[in-house]
From Swiss-Prot, chain A:
The lineage of its organism: Eukaryota, Metazoa, Chordata, Craniata, Vertebrata. This is Somatolactin. It comes from Cyclopterus lumpus (Lumpsucker). Pfam families: Hormone_1 (PF00103). One of its GO terms (cellular component) is extracellular space. It comes from the Eukaryota. Belongs to the somatotropin/prolactin family. The keyword Mitochondrion does not apply.
Amino acid sequence: MHLVSVIQRGVWAVLLWPNLLASSVPLDCREEQGILSRCPSISQEKLLDRVIEHAELIYRVSEESCSLYEDMFIPLQFQRNQVGYACITKTLPVPSSKNEIQQISDKWLLHSVLMLVQSWIEPLVYLQTSLDRYNAAPEMLLNKTKWVSEKLISLEQGVVVLIKKMLDEGMLTINHSEQGLLQNGVQPQMLESVMRDYTLLSCFKKDAHKMEAFLKLLKCRQTDRYNCS
Amino acid sequence: GAMMRKVILLLLLLCFTAHTRGKLHSPPAKPGLTSCRSPEKETFTCWWKPGSDGGLPTTHALYYRKESSETVYECPDYHTAGENSCFFNKNDTSIWVNYNITVVATNALGRAFSDPVEIDVVYIVKPNPPEKVTVTVMEDKGWPFLRVSWEPPHKADTRSGWITLIYELRVKLEEEIDWEMHLAGQQKMFNIFSLRSGGKYLVEVRCKPDHGFWSEWSSTSYIKVPDYFHREKSTWILITVFSTFTFLILMWLLHMNRHNLKHCILPPVPGPKIKGFDKQLLKNGKSNQIFSALVVPDFPPATSSNYEDFQVEYLEVYVRREQELVLEESKDLHNSCLKSESSTSDCDSGRGSCDSHTLLMAKCREAKEGERQTDRECSPMRTEAQRRLKDWEEEALNYAHAGIVSLEMSSGRVKTWPSVFSPLPRYSSSPLDQQSSLQMAKQLSLSTSSYLTQPGHSTKEALGQSYWDLCLSSKQPHLLNPPTPVCRELQAHSDVNISSIGHKRAPAGPRSPALHTTEYVEVQRVDNKDTLLLQPVVQGCGRMGGCFQMPHGEVYSKVKGVDSDNVLLLQREGMGEDRCPCVEQETNEVTGSCHKSCTVSTTQKPSGCIYTAVPVRDEMATMANGYVDTATMCTLHTC
């Protein structure tokens, strides 16, 4: 009987041997592998490129939305110039001058980008709701703004991953400052929704451009440290 | 027993295990993840293929893990994408991280894990086919073409640039098998040219993102190209028709003129155009016949206006034997004359023997006799005057001077060297007034010319023979138009090749026929055919006896010979106011001595002194006995 049991176990083992190898072993990732690749993670360069591309897209779409809104709701030029000083993200410790940007480290670049992104998620949602209340808001404008808000969230995720990869930092808690930027940044004279929305759009456009610039600078620094500006 | 039972059990176990795979319940087999696809880079779906379920109801579950995170999530949506699929929506899809996906099959007896798969969403994008593919037929200057337009799949966000798609379309005729592929890039419209008139086309479009897979082909669009006529084709048809007509007309014209063309392109080879030349004779090889056939019957011309002024009497010229023989063969009328004379000719080289006085005399007599015969025979060819001249000649012969070397030639006999003849001096005492000096001269000239123009032709001589009947007769002056005695002095010398005869001066004035038989013929001129035109001279040397004597000098000229240029050299004898030289035969002439220098006179007396230099044939022979000596040559100039 002992032999029989041993034989049985052996037979079972033989029959079930493929299952023993069920757990996969992660293989080394290669850059060029396509579908069903066995790479455990996306490489850093690839990730950075994607983030930059993402940021570019967001900027482009925001620019289109802004110009669309301008043409429709802000006909007079003098009104367009008023929004320059009312951006809600003024208070953020984001470098704004070229000198500052050149001196800042990679880490701070990334953190700045992340701050920007995170600070705009909420306002965009607000903007979306505001635009929905319009009577004559064009469909395209609404779609664009909606798209932008969605992509912004995605961008945030990407930047987080990027930070984790580049800086080997742990998962940063997405700290949405609920300080009510809107409440702080809204000028009293900007109660008019149109102007408010317009301000939001244009400010966001600027910040999106800033994000894109930071990321590109970061990339440039990755390849050639001393020639970037 | 126990051993056998164990063995049996083992065998049974093996059988069961073998059976288990097909029929008995068992844990499920390992499933396999077939593919994961994202249509717009915002969501994606994964499909798996389950293994055998082991006979028991088996459930499958998909678990995924995000990159560098140990948290295992289960598929949020098993139903949206259909059977054995897992759908990841927008919130669950991140382009920043890779996904590690595993499918697990579970049944009552166990579990089965599929091989895990790493997914990068960006690289698994396979868009939907393009939508709203429209094909229209458009026209471009009469040539139709297809315009294909489409839209990207509605899910792909190409507007914002989230996905960049490139398109490709394919076209084929309905009856064809192979497709024609066209890459359209990022544009959403494409033109297709070079269509077949009346053909039915099938068009399909597909797209692909930057990194990803080609989509499926869109649904086929059908289009029929309307029939159109090639404008170019009609032009070509017109051109072809016109050119065919033109070509046919040209061919017809060529056909009508083919003979002319043949003459133009391939001109016929000219044959020999010698009058009387018979090719057949040449082929037969009888040269004699050929040459005889070439004899021009009417040559020298019987009448010539140039000679009308002359009254010519007979001239007798000796001819060489061989020539006589040839002459015999000639078909002319003169042949009869020739033949009659053949016996009397002596054609040895030393013609001088013939020319000796005695011989001449003898010959003259014979000739005279023969002449009579020939006269009779040739009567049709002679005028009465000629006959009379001949009679006179006979008389003259009787009175031949010793000092006179005269060669009397019987009629019909021409004495010639190759193409040279010298007329015999005639002594004629009979008045020759009535002789037609012109006629004589004519005859002389004619015969001369005959010799001259056809050197070596005996026929010529034969021709001349008849004319050369030196039948000067002074007795028949009336026969001659100008009543001038014809003084003819012809020196016929066998040794002398004299192509022309110098002036023959007819002694002026009547002479006693018995004593002065010299007749002078004046060479009127030589025409371009080397014809010596003789004119009986009636002039100052008419003294009967003086013509042949030195005193006649001024009017005489002696044929001295012929120079190398075939020029008849005449020696002017003596002088006289009348500067017509005449050829005189002096018996006392020494060979080679010119009594007088020839007076080259370019002026012509109206009486018709003609100096001619006539080309003489090649042979030169010195004369003997005072005949014209080639050694001393005096050239005469034509008037």
